[in-house]
């Protein structure tokens, strides 16, 4: 009668040993207070956001600046800060792989061979031949395979994988945050550079106007129709304007150098020509406050760090339970060496061991308490990061709203100041006022023009900041699961986002969507 051996019980036992149980708390994201509206945008009602309710893809195209469009994609591939964080992410992925390996047995093979001279008085019969004076030459050898396996009965290894996987995702989110931060820094530097160019154009026009005023005053001085002090005043104004124009070159050079470094180039490698065009103020869809939890990579980093700390509690708790190991050996051993692989020389062994700590002076309880404290610190960091995110967006929105009002007022002020300068100069030529009145009007006009340009710069910077504080089109759905390496892309989403086709942001609001900020 034949015996049938079923593989099902063996498979079930293996599954039990592999699965075991997992001690320690399972992770659940803690609740945070999320406002229904942004206070700086009254009338906003909470709704599920549509795809158009956040910056998308190449958000920088909304500024309509050729330099920005050319350089922004280079940040993700050439910026050295991003490169460093990418390497850190690769290291984190490797740590997940290392942790996963502990789930499986370690298989090895050992081979050895020995040839030795035995003493003449040896009684061993394991020799192949004799040499002079009765000495013996002994040959021996072995070929063995061995297996060792530490069983993860309590989930310590799986909690370690959970911890390392969450850490890897935190590293990926950190990479995304670094990429976004460097892209916003580039946008800021380009805006500063363009503002510097606009200031240069303004002062060049001012110098030209002052040269004309000085020429008129100098001609009148030749005929004695004006006081000599008028010439001095006009010349002083002109030279001050020229000095200010020269000084702008320092700041512009620094902005250009910063731009080069942000795209991974030496400053001398990047020549940025002067441009008279300022970037366009983009439309920035804001969306509901709750969506910021998914859009900000720094929040994702904090959340994943929290998950990693939660897993360490399980690792610490697992230390209370015994460690169970299995081992096996299978192979051949023979002395003398001839016929090593014969069935008669076959050997094997199976074994197991269990180790349990009886007393550790409170070490394990201390480890558990420390893990729980670290988790609570991570929770506080997560909630603090969320609060800071809401603060950042509110600051950006209030800045854009107030600066828009200031820009409207300055437009009127610049028009009036320009007209006032014309009137003052005409009155001076008519002899009804002295040149001090003209100089005062000119100074007021230049100051108002520079202030208006500064406000325009601030609005652009706030718009860039708002885009960054909303996540720049990033989403935590782009995070990869490092436990499934086959699904990992060659480059994480943060680095590949820069090559996304340009996506123009829409100024149309969907039902219940956030009004666009202009």
Q: Whereabouts are the PLM-identified features?
A:
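Membrane-embedded beta-strand positions in outer-membrane beta-barrel channels/transporters
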Residues: 72, 142-146, 190, 289, ...
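Sec/SRP-type N-terminal targeting helices
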Residues: 83-84, 100, 137, 151-179, ...
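Heptad-repeat amphipathic alpha-helical coiled-coil interaction surface used
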Residues: 89-91, 96-98, 113, 161, ...
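Periplasmic alpha-helical coiled-coil/stalk elements that build and connect Gram-negative outer-membrane
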Residues: 157, 173-288, 399, 403, ...
């Amino acid at each position: 009668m034949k015996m049938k051996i079923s593989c099902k019980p063996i498979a079930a036992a293996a599954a039990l040993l592999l699965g075991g149980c997992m001690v320690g708390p399972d992770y659940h994201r803690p609740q945070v207070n999320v406002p229904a509206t942004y206070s700086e945008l009254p009338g906003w009602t909470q709704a599920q956001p549509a795809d158009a309710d956040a910056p998308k893809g190449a958000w920088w195209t909304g500024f309509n600046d050729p330099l920005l469009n050319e350089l922004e994609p280079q940040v993700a591939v050439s910026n050295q800060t991003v490169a460093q964080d990418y390497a850190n992410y690769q290291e984190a992925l490797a740590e997940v792989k290392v942790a996963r390996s502990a789930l499986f047995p370690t298989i090895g093979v050992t081979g050895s061979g020995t040839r030795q001279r035995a003493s003449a008085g040896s009684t061993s019969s394991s020799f192949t031949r004799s040499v002079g004076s009765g000495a013996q030459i002994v040959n021996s050898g072995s070929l063995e395979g061995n297996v060792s396996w530490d069983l993860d009965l309590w989930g310590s290894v799986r909690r370690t994988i959970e911890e390392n996987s969450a850490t890897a995702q935190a590293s990926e989110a950190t990479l995304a945050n670094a990429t976004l931060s460097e892209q916003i820094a580039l946008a800021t530097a380009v805006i500063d550079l363009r503002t510097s160019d606009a200031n240069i154009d303004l002062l060049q026009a001012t110098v030209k106007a002052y040269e004309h005023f000085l020429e008129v005053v100098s001609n009148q001085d030749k005929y004695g129709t004006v006081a000599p002090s008028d010439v001095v005043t006009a010349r002083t104004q002109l030279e001050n304007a020229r000095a200010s124009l020269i000084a702008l070159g320092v700041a512009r050079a620094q902005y250009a150098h910063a731009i080069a470094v942000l795209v991974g180039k030496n400053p001398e490698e990047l020549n940025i020509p002067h441009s008279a065009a300022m970037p366009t103020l983009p439309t920035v869809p804001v969306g509901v406050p709750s969506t910021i939890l998914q859009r900000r990579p720094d929040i994702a980093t904090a959340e994943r760090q929290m998950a990693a700390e939660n897993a360490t509690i399980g690792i610490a708790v697992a230390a209370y339970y015994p460690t169970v190991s299995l081992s096996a050996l299978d192979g051949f051993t023979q002395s003398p060496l001839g016929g090593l692989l014969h069935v008669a020389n076959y050997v094997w062994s199976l074994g197991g061991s269990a180790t349990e700590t009886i007393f550790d002076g409170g070490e394990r309880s201390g480890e558990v308490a420390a893990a729980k404290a670290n988790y609570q610190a991570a929770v506080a960091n997560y909630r603090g990061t969320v609060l800071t995110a809401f603060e950042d967006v509110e600051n950006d929105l209030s800045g854009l709203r107030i600066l828009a009002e200031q820009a409207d007022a300055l437009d009127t002020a610049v028009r009036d100041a320009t007209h006032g300068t014309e009137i003052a100069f005409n009155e001076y030529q008519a002899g009804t006022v002295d040149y001090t009145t003209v100089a005062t009007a000119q100074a007021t006009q230049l100051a108002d023009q520079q202030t208006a340009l500064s406000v325009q710069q601030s609005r652009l910077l706030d718009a860039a900041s708002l885009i960054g504080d909303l996540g720049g089109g990033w989403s935590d759905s782009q995070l990869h699961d490092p436990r499934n390496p086959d699904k990992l892309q060659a480059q994480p989403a943060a680095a590949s986002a820069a090559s996304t086709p340009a996506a123009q942001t829409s100024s149309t609001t969907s039902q219940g969507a956030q009004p666009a900020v202009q």
